[in-house]
Amino acid sequence: MISFSLVIVCGAVATLLGLRLLSLFRISPEGEGRLFYAYALGWGVFAYLVLVLGLFGGLYPVSVILILTLCFLLGIGKLKTLGKDLRAFVISLREGAREVLPVPLLLVTKILVALILLVSFVGAFAPPTNMDALNYHLAVPKLYLQTHTIIFLPTMLYSATPFASEMINSLFMLIKGEVSAQLAQHLFGWALLFALFSFTKSRYGSRGGLLAVAGLLCLSSFVFVFSEPKNDMLVTLFSLLAVWSLLSWSNSDRQSDLALMGVFAGLASGTKLFGLGVAFSLFAVLVVLMLLKRYRLSKISMSLSVGLAFFSLFAFPWYLKSYLWSGNPVYPFFYGLFGGNHWNGILDYRVFQLGRESYLPVSFVNLIISPWLIVNRGEIFLARTGVVFLAILPGVFLFKRLSQEIKILGWFSLIYYLLWFFFLRDARYLMPIIPPTAIICAFIILRLEARSKLLKWLLMLTIILGLGANLLTDLKVQLPKFPGVFGTGSEEEFYRDFRETERRDHTSGKLVEAFPEYEFSRKASELLFPDSKLAVFSLDQAFYYYFFDYPYILALPMRQSLVDFASLRNDEDVSKRLRELGITHIATDVDLGGGIPDSSLVVTDSHFAPLLPGVNAFLSMLKNRSILIHAEDGFYLYELVGSVQIELPLVRTRDCPSALRR
C-alpha cells in the first residue's frame, strides 16, 4: 500500500501543478474536464522535469523529491479548486449510478465493468511480468538509474524514441520500485475511463457514459496492458483529451481550446511515436472544419499557428533529442529516409519488415474488410479489438441524423485508421481511436431506442458478451499474479512459479518456467565485480535481461549493431570489439555444444547471411572462456579472462556453489 499511496500523492501534486499551469495560461476547460486536463498536464510536465534531471546527471531520490516539493508549493494555491472538482466528479458518478441501475441490461453491463476493473486493479499490485514491459518500459529506465543519467543506449532500439511514460516510470523506480511505476500507469487507465465516462455523460447522459466505457473494455488488448507498466494508457489519455479539446473548439471557436488540443497532441507524440498519427489526424480534421466554416485564409493560418505552436512546445524536444543522438528524428523508424547511427538495413529488415510479413497485406479490399478481420481474426493484427468497430456500422443508416460531434469523432478515427492500416497494422496501436469509436457506439445504441429496439438490444447483448469474454481473459491474466500481490511467497518464488506466459516446452507444449532468468541473474550478480560489464548474447529466443543489476549491453545479432556481427570474422575481431566496449562477462542462452540451431533466422533467412561468420566467431570465442555458471535452465555466464575452460557440473542457478563468489 505504500506504493499505491505514493502514486496517489504524486497524482495529487501533478493535478495541482496542472491546475496552476492552466490558470497561468488563462485556459479554463469546460466542466468536469478541468480535473482530467490538469491531472494529465501535470504528469506530462513531470515527464519533462525527469528528462531534464536525467540529461544533467541528476537522477537521485533527493532530486526527485525536491522537484515534487517545489511543484506542490507552486500548486498549493489550487487546493480548493482541486477539492471542488473532486467533489463535483464524485457527485456526478453517484448520480450516474442511480440513473443506470433501474435498466436490467445496463445493470449487468455495470457489474461486468466493475468486475473487470476490480480484477485488473488487484493484478496491478503484482511484480511486473509482461516481457515488453520488463525488457523495454522498465529496462531502459533501470539502466538510466544505474548511472543517474539519461544517455543514448544504442543496443536498446527504442531508447531514443519519445519516452514521457518511461520518464514517469523512472521517477517511481527511483523512489520506490517498479510496482509503484506499474500502479502509476494503471491509474492512467482509470483516469482514461473516468474521462471517457464524464465526456460522454456530459453529452449523452449516464447511460451513454457507461456504454462508452463498456465499449472500451470490450477491447481484448486493453485488459492485457491495463495492469502493466506500459505507455498505452497514458498515450490514449492524452489523445482523448486532445480530441475533447477539438470538439470543444468546434462549439466555441475559442483559441484556448486549440491550445489545449496542441498541448495534448504534443504530449501524445512525446509518449509514443504513433502519437504523431494522432496529431496529424487532429490537425487534418481541424483544417476540414475551418474550411466548412468558411474561415478566411488569415484566420485559418492564425488558428493553425496556435495549435501547432503548443504542439511543437510539447513534442519537439523528444524528436530533437532523437535527432541529436542518432541522426534520425524518428529513430529507428524510416531508416531508408533518415538513416540512423548504430542501425543498418539488416536490422531494419528484422525489426520492421520481417515481422510485418505475417500481417494483412496492404490492398483496397483488405482495407475495406479489415474492421471485420480485426474482430474475428485478430491474430493477423496480434490482438482483437472487440465489438466496437462492428457496433458502429448501423450508424451508416443514421448518417443524416448524426450530430456534428459524432461526425468529427468519425473523421478523426477514419484518418487515423487509414494511417494505421498503411504503416502499423498492429491492433494495440489502435488504442487512441478506441475511445472515440466507443462514444460513437454508445451514441448509436441510444439513438436506436426509437428506431429499432431489436437492433439496440442485439448490440447491447453483443457488448455484454464481449465484456464477459474479457472478464474471463482478465481472470486468466491476473489470477496467476495474485500470489505476488498477497505475499504468499517471496519474489524469487513468484518469478520461479509463474506460468502464465507463452514460453512452452517444444515437446509437450506445456507452459514452462516463465522467468528462469530471475534466479540466473541473481546468481550472476553474486559473482560479478562492482566494475563488471555484461553483454547479453541471444539469437531468436526471448531473453528477460531486465533482472540484471549490473550495466549491460545487448549483443543481439539481429537487434543492434554496436557489436557489428557483419564485420567480425574471427575470435580476434570479437575479443577486440568486446575489449573496446569494456565487456568483462557474457550472459547467454545459446548452447555452445549445439552451435547455431538450424531453425535460427540467421541460418534460414538469406537476409542475415552477412551475420553468420560473426555469430560463429562469437561462439568460437566463448568456447575458450571460463564458465562461471552453467544452469540447468540453459543459461550460461562466461568470464572474458584467461583461456582455460572451467567445467562445472550441470546445476540449477539456485544451487550454484557459493565457493564461486569473488
Please tell me what each predicted stretch does.
Residues S508-A555, H585-G593, Y638:
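Short periplasmic/luminal acceptor-recognition loop of GT-C membrane glycosyltransferases, typified by
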Residues G18-L19, G44, F72-K78, L183-R203, ...:
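Transmembrane-helix motifs of polytopic, lipid-linked glycan transferases
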Residues K201-S202, A242-L260, R294, R401:
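Membrane-interface transmembrane helices that cradle and orient dolichyl/undecaprenyl
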Residues S28-A38, V179-S180, L196-L219, L237, ...:
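Transmembrane-helix signature of polytopic, membrane-embedded enzymes
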Residues A114, A191-L193, F197, V287, ...:
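Hydrophobic, aromatic-rich transmembrane alpha-helices
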Residues M131-H137, G466-K523, Q541-A542:
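Membrane-proximal, lumen/periplasm-facing interface regions of secretory-pathway glyco-
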Residues M1-A97, W420, V574-S575:
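Membrane-embedded, hydrophobic transmembrane alpha-helices
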Residues L106-V113, R207, A259-A265, A279-L286, ...:
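Signature aromatic-anchored transmembrane alpha helix within multi-pass, membrane-resident enzymes
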